[in-house]
Amino acid sequence: GIRIIAPIPGKGTIGIEVPNKNPKIVSGQSVIGSKKFQESKYDLPIVLGKTITNEVFMFDLCKMPHVLVAGATGQGKSVGLNAIITSLLYKKHPAELKFVLVDPKKVEFSIYSVIENHFLAKLPDGGEPIITDVTKVVQTLNSVCVEMDTRYDLLKMAHVRNIKEY
C-alpha cells in the first residue's frame, strides 16, 4: 500500500511512499565505477546506491559525526555496512585507513579477513582480525578509545581541530 508521512519532520512537505512494482537491482560495480564516485573530492566518500531519479547516492562520512544503523531482521543493515566498507576500500590506501570490525554472528564480515594485513587493525595481543568473541569487545573498544585520546593529544599539540588540518 501507499504510506503517507505528513508532515515530514523539519520540512513543510508531505511524503508519499509508493511501492515500486518493478524494482531494479543496483550493482555495487555500477555505483563504485560511476564517474561521480570515481571523481569525488569527498574525504571519506560513501556510495550507497541510486536515488529514485537513478542518480548515484553518496555522502562524505567526514560530515557525519555519528552513524546509527538499526532495523528489523532482513532490512539491509549488513548490506548498508558492506557498502560503507567497500566504498572506503575502493577510495583509500591502507596507510590512510584501518578498520576494527566486530562480528558477533561470525559470518557478516568474515569476507574481510583476507585484507587483514592491509586494512584491519587488531589488538597487540593478536587474535583474530575480526572480533567475534563478545567478551573481547569491551577491551577492543577501550583500546580504540586510548588510540583516539592519543590522536586528540597530537591534534591539541599541533593546535589544529581535525585530521585534515593536521
Predicted features along the sequence, with ranges:
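P-loop NTPase catalytic phosphate-binding loop
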Residues: 5-17, 25, 30, 35-161
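Surface-exposed substrate-engagement region within the catalytic domains
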Residues: 20
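Short, intrinsically disordered, charge-balanced linker/junction segments flanking boundaries
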Residues: 163-166
